[in-house]
Amino acid sequence: MEKKLPRRLEGKVAIVTASTQGIGFGITERFGLEGASVVVSSRKQANVDEAVAKLKSKGIDAYGIVCHVSNAQHRRNLVEKTVQKYGKIDIVVCNAAANPSTDPILSSKEAVLDKLWEINVKSSILLLQDMAPHLEKGSSVIFITSIAGFSPQGAMAMYGVTKTALLGLTKALAAEMAPDTRVNAVAPGFVPTHFASFITGSSEVREGIEEKTLLNRLGTTGDMAAAAAFLASDDSSYITGETLVVAGGMPSRL
């Protein structure tokens, strides 16, 4: 029997970037099931169409827009088409991310460093610059950072550094966008999605990760979606500038 969810987001309009699969799709689905109208976005039209169809099959009001977050015109289209259809924006989840290389930082090519910064940090800032005039009073911005942001090392070192930057960006924008918009972040632990398959695809590595968590398991997209829904809702109306770590008890101090 499916758990009945509260309708905390009734009447809200939510945009989630990179939301056709994995954590992004999980968040979009949860928002929709809690009553929000959701805007799905991703780089490929086929993926957007498939995700929208899945959401609509569950009775969710879903709208899809192709958006590569590093493309300025795509970002503007995402904002403009959402406002044209719904008249407002209440919730923004910046989920798009890239990890094009597992090289050590001092061996990383400049093009890789540029892409990591552009997709993981800069694109979210530019997107919010476009969205800010349309955000409703009481709106919520959520960055998806990572447990790797607290201890950037190994194959995720430079990726982790960009996620550390999001911890600071959350604090900075919470101050800049207050009091009308709250800005928070979710820091997922290890979740077995396609994006993380280079790590979680190995049973040996998975077991090692599970041993490091107090709850002895990997995270799920549902775990991350529940955290995002809380931060998007009025249940967190007195919370801003914070990062909610959802990592089963893995160490999370800078």
From Swiss-Prot:
InterPro entries noted in UniProt: NAD(P)-bd_dom_sf, Sc_DH/Rdtase_CS, SDR_fam
SUPFAM superfamilies tied to this protein: NAD(P)-binding Rossmann-fold domains
Superkingdom assignment: Eukaryota
GO terms under cellular component: cytosol; peroxisome
EC numbers: 1.1.-.-
One of the Pfam families matching this protein, by short name: adh_short_C2
Taxonomic lineage of the native organism: Eukaryota, Viridiplantae, Streptophyta, Embryophyta, Tracheophyta
GO molecular function annotation: oxidoreductase activity
Keywords: Fatty acid metabolism, Lipid metabolism, Oxidoreductase, Peroxisome
Impact reported for residue 43 to C: In ibr1-1; resistance to the inhibitory effect of intermediate levels of indole-3-butyric acid (IBA) on root elongation
Result after altering residue 140 to F: In ibr1-8; resistance to the inhibitory effect of intermediate levels of indole-3-butyric acid (IBA) on root elongation
Gene Ontology annotations of biological process type: fatty acid metabolic process; indolebutyric acid metabolic process; response to indolebutyric acid; root hair elongation
Gene3D superfamilies: NAD(P)-binding Rossmann-like Domain
Role this protein plays: Involved with IBR3 and IBR10 in the peroxisomal beta-oxidation of indole-3-butyric acid (IBA) to form indole-3-acetic acid (IAA), a biologically active auxin. May be responsible for catalyzing the dehydrogenation step in the conversion of IBA. May be involved in the peroxisomal activation of 2,4-dichlorophenoxybutyric acid (2,4-DB), a precursor of active auxins that inhibit root growth.
Gene for this chain: SDRA
Protein's UniProt name: Short-chain dehydrogenase/reductase SDRA
Span(s) of short sequence motif Microbody targeting signal: 252-254
Primary location class: other
Disruption phenotype: Defective in root hair expansion. Mutant plants are resistant to the inhibitory effect of intermediate levels of indole-3-butyric acid (IBA) and 2,4-DB on root elongation.
Binding-site residues, substrate: 146
Residues the entry annotates as binding NADP(+): 15-39
Family recorded in the similarity comment: Belongs to the short-chain dehydrogenases/reductases (SDR) family.
Subcellular location field: Peroxisome
Active-site residues per Swiss-Prot or TrEMBL entry: 159 (proton acceptor)
Transmembrane segments: none
